[in-house]
């Protein structure tokens, strides 16, 4: 698969936006065009960002993607019953999926919560990679994990660009 979804999953106010802010090293919002994501001082990939989750916005993810067939999509996803519709869109459109689950999230209790929606077997059964991180902790190390994953995936597909 030559398309990648990096999803940050969590409850409302779990740290999804903080993750994107840390990854881009600045405040970012959903845009209408592709943007550069620097993976180090000189190398970058071109990505499409959906910062506010489709679930919170009450919109289908395809309504939020305003460019044709982006190779890399970064998308916030909210842990609620309709989130699988968002993942199904990416599965049905040939995306490899990496899910960065904030569990517990920043505003959750201190305990990891049970996957009551059954997302784990559905995602893993469709070949997704799933990691779980504490959204209450400093995002530096988990964001570095995202950066390294994107770099490796993009390098293999010759999608790394440089200034």
Where are the model-predicted features located?
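A general structural motif
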Residues: 1-3, 70, 94-96
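Glycine-rich phosphate-binding P-loop
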Residues: 3-25
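Phosphate/oxyanion-binding active-site loops and adjacent basic polyanion-contact surfaces
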Residues: 16, 53-57, 138-146
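A generic secondary-structure boundary signal that marks alpha-helix termini
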Residues: 28-29, 155
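Conserved nucleotide-sensing/catalytic segment adjacent to the nucleotide-binding pocket
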Residues: 29-92
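Generic structural motif
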Residues: 11, 54, 104-105
């Amino acid at each position: 698969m030559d398309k990648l979804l990096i999803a940050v999953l969590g409850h409302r106010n779990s740290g999804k936006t903080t993750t994107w802010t840390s990854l881009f090293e600045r405040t970012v919002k959903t845009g209408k065009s592709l943007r550069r994501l620097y993976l180090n001082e000189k190398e970058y990939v071109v990505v499409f960002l959906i910062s506010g989750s489709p679930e919170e916005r009450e919109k289908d993810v395809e309504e939020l993607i305003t460019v044709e067939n982006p190779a890399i999509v970064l998308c916030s996803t909210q842990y609620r019953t309709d989130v699988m519709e968002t993942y199904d869109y990416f599965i049905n459109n040939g995306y490899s999926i990496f899910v960065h689950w904030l569990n517990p999230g920043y505003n959750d209790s201190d305990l990891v919560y049970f996957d009551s929606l059954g997302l784990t077997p559905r995602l893993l059964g469709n070949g997704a990679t799933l990691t779980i991180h504490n959204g209450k902790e400093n995002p530096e190390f988990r964001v570095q994990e995202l950066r390294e994953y994107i770099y490796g995936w993009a390098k293999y597909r010759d999608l790394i660009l440089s200034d």
